[in-house]
Regions:
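Conserved N-terminal segment of class I S-adenosyl-L-methionine
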Residues: 1-184, 193-199, 259-265, 271-275, ...
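Short, glycine-/aromatic-enriched active-site segment of Class I SAM-dependent methyltransferases
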Residues: 27-41, 212-239, 244-249
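Active-site micro-motifs of SAM-dependent methyltransferase domains
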Residues: 65, 188, 219
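Hydrophobic/aromatic residues located in beta-strands of well-ordered beta-sheets
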Residues: 149, 210-212
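Short catalytic micro-motifs in class I SAM-dependent methyltransferases
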Residues: 184-191, 236
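Helix-to-beta-strand junctions that scaffold the AdoMet/dcAdoMet cofactor pocket
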Residues: 190-191, 204-206
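A structural motif corresponding to the C-terminal end of an alpha-helix
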Residues: 249, 253-255
Length: 297
């Protein structure tokens, strides 16, 4: 059987430094990683293609950003997102990792973002690009609030399932600027996140809003537990951001972090009180990898 092919990222994905420090490494077909891969739902299993192949997780000695140095080549990443992550595999993963409650809370989560964008941006109609939009759930909520919203997603299975306007590539966009661009749990999947964000910056109106959200990989340096695997899956989550490194990543590309306005998607006084408490105590609470930025300059 043909083995999957990898390329090496030998400079930092955030600052470009070549000072990379090894955190952990191993073979795909050995240890806990092999067992975790075998448990996951797949269309066509990637495990036979990964026999003897090496993974290597590193950290930048200059800016502390951590990432997998060995990533699939473009050809094999296309296989990853079409054959391995098939529509059936995605549906099974979502079924076993959630259910109706997960969908409900995700809708609430997205609605809060919509209300916050409406508060931050005066322009109407408000134009939003959701990059890596998946099934288009956030876009659907944007449309309900009267936004002009389109998405981009490279997964054929997810594009086919979406009931809204989703393109395979940003090259298909019409060139009109967007007031806001969102990347919900996308940066961790990208071979070249800096290059992608530079490209997206060109589609954002002056003073436009950028929302970034990734898993928080604070303290994760190796793959020993399911939590580790979920954070830095070497086929899917190839970049491991923390609140500090995510902020630094965006700031290097010309974005300034801003506070999120308060929004309440509830009639519960208790939940409103908790939201207000988080707003007031925000600087004292733990940092998060859900961050808002404004394009400067």
């Amino acid at each position: 059987m043909t083995r999957a092919q990898f390329k090496t990222r030998d400079t930092c994905i955030s600052c470009g430094s070549g000072d990379l420090q090894r955190l952990s490494d191993g073979r795909f077909d050995q240890g806990p990683l092999r067992e975790f891969l075998l448990r996951d739902p797949w269309g066509e299993s990637p495990v036979p293609y990964l026999a003897g192949q090496l993974w290597r997780y590193v950290k930048c000695g200059t800016c502390d950003t951590a990432f997998h140095a060995n990533v699939l080549t473009p050809e094999w990443n296309d296989i990853n997102f079409s054959r391995w992550m098939s529509a059936e595999a995605i549906a099974e993963f979502e079924r076993t990792h959630g259910g109706p409650d997960r969908l409900f809370y995700r809708a609430m989560h997205y609605t809060k973002h919509v209300l916050q964008l409406a508060s931050l941006i005066e322009a109407r109609p408000l134009r939003v690009l959701d990059f890596g939009c998946g099934n288009g759930e956030f876009l659907a909520i944007c449309h309900q609030f009267g936004f002009e919203a389109v998405g981009v997603d490279r997964s054929t299975a997810r594009r086919d399932k979406a009931g809204v306007n989703v393109f395979a590539s940003a090259d298909e966009l019409d060139g009109r600027p967007f007031n806001a661009i969102t990347l919900f749990e996308v940066l961790e999947h990208l071979d070249d996140p800096s290059g992608i964000l530079k490209m997206l910056r060109g589609h954002l109106a002056p003073g436009g809003i950028l929302i970034l959200e990734t898993p928080d990989c604070s303290g994760v340096e190796r793959i020993e537990t399911m939590h580790d695997y979920g954070c830095i899956h070497p086929l899917q989550h190839i970049n491991g951001f923390t609140p500090e490194t995510l902020r630094g990543f965006a700031e290097r590309l010309g974005f300034e972090e801003i506070g999120k306005p308060v929004s309440h998607v509830t009639t519960s006084p208790v939940k409103v009180a908790k939201t207000e408490a988080r707003r007031v105590l925000g600087p004292l609470l733990s940092l998060t990898t859900q961050q808002y930025f404004r394009l400067t300059g």
